[in-house]
Amino acid sequence: MASLWSEAHPTSLPGALWRLYLVRAALRHTIENSRVLFQEGVDQLNTIDQVVAGAPDPLDTKGLEKVLDDVLRGAFSGDLAQALERAAAIARAISAGSLHYSWINERDAHDLATRSLNWSIIARELSTSATTAREGKLS
């Protein structure tokens, strides 16, 4: 099912679900690295993303994973816009953490910059989807 969503417009319901799936897959495959990059991003940003993400200090990825799993299984009973905004906040922090990571070197710089850009794009699309969902127009 997720592969059908991959071509959907970013601010459609299938497109938003695809982006949630991507965030979930990335967290599942790189839990510790994602936690470190998230915390590095939170340390660098002067935003409320950690609060919006609903993340304790340090980040507990299990809570976000459960929300994303519930949304993707259709078992989520909460506010979809809030879930989208939380995932966007996580993505923004990981994006920032990828650029500011303390051990960055020339060999890793290109990959981390690309990863940061990808997370930034996903964050923006999820935020836009959250706004669209709040307006009742996410379809």
Predicted regions and their residues:
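Solenoid-repeat scaffolds in large eukaryotic assemblies
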Residues: 2-3, 83
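Long, charge-patterned amphipathic interaction tracts in eukaryotic proteins
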Residues: 3-67
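Short secondary-structure junctions and interdomain/linker hinges
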Residues: 8-13, 27-34, 74-82, 94-101, ...
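Alpha-helical oligomerization segments
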Residues: 96-139
